[in-house]
């Protein structure tokens, strides 16, 4: 049986590739970034991916925002990842796109709409 090894970021050929990066940017409280350390600590990874010709796709969240009365998941400006997006855009001089989520009451969670994701993925693949 062949031994498979996972390449490090420095070893990987990222030219023209889309790289999914799970980041812990869960630092927004009441619509503001309390401490940017977690965001800042990902700059080297994001920049390395770009330097190697890759296109990073960041995946994060901001807590589990629930309405205190109903217990339902809510999507409000104060629990949005937009403060993180604006911070990254400013610090790294990037343009970042964030897909919109749609509430699915029957399931009690948010899902990505195909109508939203298909154009974003198309742009990502074409390098826009």
Task: List each model region and its residues.
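Active-site loop-to-helix "anion-binding N-cap" substructures in soluble metabolic enzymes
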Residues: 1-128
